[in-house]
Amino acid sequence: MSQEKQVFSIDLAGRQLTVETGQLAKQANGAVLVRYGDTAVLSTATASKEAKNVDFFPLTVNYEERLYAVGKIPGGFIKREGRPSEKAILASRLIDRPIRPLFADGFRNEVQVVSIVMSVDQDCSSEMAAMLGSSLALSISDIPFEGPIAGATVGRINGEFVINPTVEQQEQSDIHLVVAGTKDAINMVEAGADQVPEETMLEAIMFGHDEIKRLIAFQEEIVQAVGKEKSEVKLYEVDADLNQAVREMAEKDMHSAIQVHEKHAREDAINEVKKRVIEHYEAEEADADTLGQVNEILYKIVKEEVRRLITVEKIRPDGRKGDEIRPLASEVGILSRTHGSGLFTRGQTQALSICTLGALGDVQILDGLGVEESKRFMHHYNFPSFSVGETRPMRGPGRREIGHGALGERALEPVIPSEKDFPYTVRLVSEVLESNGSTSQASICGSTLAMMDAGVPLKAPVAGIAMGLVKSGEHYTILSDIQGMEDHLGDMDFKVAGTAQGVTALQMDIKIDGLSREILEEALQQAKIGRVHILNHMLSVIAEPRTELSAYAPKIITMTINPDKIRDVIGPSGKQINKIIEETGVKIDIEQDGTVFISSINQEMNDKAKKIIEDIVREVQVGEIYEGKVKRVEKFGAFVELFSGKDGLVHISELALERVGKVEDVVKIGDVITVKVIEIDKQGRVNLSRKVLLKEEQEKEAAKEEDKQEQQ
């Protein structure tokens, strides 16, 4: 690899993308600086010289955000970046997933790919720059990576597909798709959509793949110019004689154990075979390396037999047909004090989702490398160890939990009613109670049930299903509603969520080089059939959202005030609004256009707060009559409170019909009197009269008396 700085450029969606090599991070196995517009990402790849003594490929991908990239200084006392943001974690997963399948089986050297975001142009995706940079850093290095790969974001505006849409274009788009792959096939999909038909999603994926091919050709030119020769690495292999001996000892019994339909009984049967074989070699005092190889051989026996049964005999581990969905059971309203709850069970996978409604002030503020914005819909996913019958420390959410939560959020967001139609913040929490595959999709189904139970007026119910694939040469079998073993030992995990009308979210991960259009098309159509079946089941439990909210959910009333009056409601340093909140216990959120949201569990307090605000913003008109309380008495007259925050003066000459010597002779502080507005001067001061009303009353009485006399 040349140590001189070299620069390569290509046009990407009308903006220049530049790759620089040979100047930065030269001690890494591979390093590139990718500039896309004003976005700049440094991507590096390093690998250990020796293989690690582990039974998996130790790859770590880190997408590192630096706030200097957008000219910000971190908040807090420490003033430096802390733990990765949710966006950074999701970006790390996005890069990891298409890269991981492109390392050889048996490769055990530790590999770390790090992308540091150094400058951000909001219209030029730093995630896509990091994905390209990660692929290039590996490809030009001596690490035996079988890439390159590339990624592209695809939007659709007015029926036209757009590559790498700008922020403004994303707001208009009904598809938000990230697709990645090699020049020959697609190996990763992540998408959100607004109930888009399967055929359109497939076209969007293939449209993105056309751009991927162009970006890979660009990378191949760079590799040709500056790439290092790949290292010769010894791949992990088991001893041939040991392999034959273990297979003779275990294969027959393992084949029988695999065909036990119930998950735990099947696992017990498989573990019993493993235990017998391991104990045999332990009795022969086999060393740790030999025992490790024995475990590897036993794993391969299980994998090969499961795949053979599915592709050749068309038998799944639990006895189902390829397109068969496990038994479904659902229930709503099982938690009395929550605002809404839904329990969704599919075979041995179970999720309990809880919906909580809050005021608009409860929105989540997102402040990272992107434009600062708020989020009024949230979905969080928890995967406790008891869901798989295991024990482990209870810690915060990991990458997988954050990823599954984000997938559920993306699937449900298109059907959430607008703020205008439903002025609430909505938070969903999905607790996985049992796991045997497809828990993320169960959480989507449970969340739909919970929101319908809570009375959220969804545009349409959403269900999710996980599709699998087992491929052997040109032969393949697509599986609906995969369970844990099929996910673990198969070639694909393709999650599809949506309504009866179309797709709202996709996520695809594969363990092989890639998938053809034909397989993707078949998987999407089979997923649609399964999704509609699940939706019909859910609607048999609750046909439509409840018309009334829970008694324990906040009641929200909306009112509109003159925007010029907002400062009056807030008051100096928030004094006025805090007084209202303290007096009524409500939450108040005010938009710049003068829309006011008042929320509380107590409707009476909502009404009280509304009345106070109405009084504050009310405009006094000449001729209006008020019943007010005397707040202050002066020699020249009395000050009367017409309503909260608005006083007027009754001059001494306007207190009574007769001449008044002292104000106190007529009124005192605390008296409630009826007054009429007779003038509002240029300074906005309100002049009142009691005398005018007394005179009007006197004239009415005189007229009545006159009428009575005429009748006599």
Curated annotation (Swiss-Prot):
Domain KH, chain residue ranges per copy: 554-613
Localisation per UniProt entry: Cytoplasm
A Pfam family it matches: KH_1
This protein's UniProt keywords: Cytoplasm, Magnesium, Metal-binding, Nucleotidyltransferase, RNA-binding, Transferase
Gene3D superfamilies the record matches: GHMP Kinase, N-terminal domain, K Homology domain, type 1, Nucleic acid-binding proteins
SUPFAM superfamilies: Eukaryotic type KH-domain (KH-domain type I) (SSF54791), Nucleic acid-binding proteins (SSF50249), Ribonuclease PH domain 2-like (SSF55666), Ribosomal protein S5 domain 2-like (SSF54211)
GO cellular component terms given for this protein: cytosol
Reaction catalysed by this enzyme: RNA(n+1) + phosphate = RNA(n) + a ribonucleoside 5'-diphosphate
Positions of Mg(2+) binding: 487, 493
GO molecular function: 3'-5'-RNA exonuclease activity; magnesium ion binding; polyribonucleotide nucleotidyltransferase activity; RNA binding
Co-factor(s): Mg(2+)
Biological processes, Gene Ontology terms: mRNA catabolic process; RNA processing
Protein family per UniProt: Belongs to the polyribonucleotide nucleotidyltransferase family.
Function noted in UniProt: Involved in mRNA degradation. Catalyzes the phosphorolysis of single-stranded polyribonucleotides processively in the 3'- to 5'-direction.
Protein name: Polyribonucleotide nucleotidyltransferase
Species, as recorded: Bacillus cereus (strain G9842)
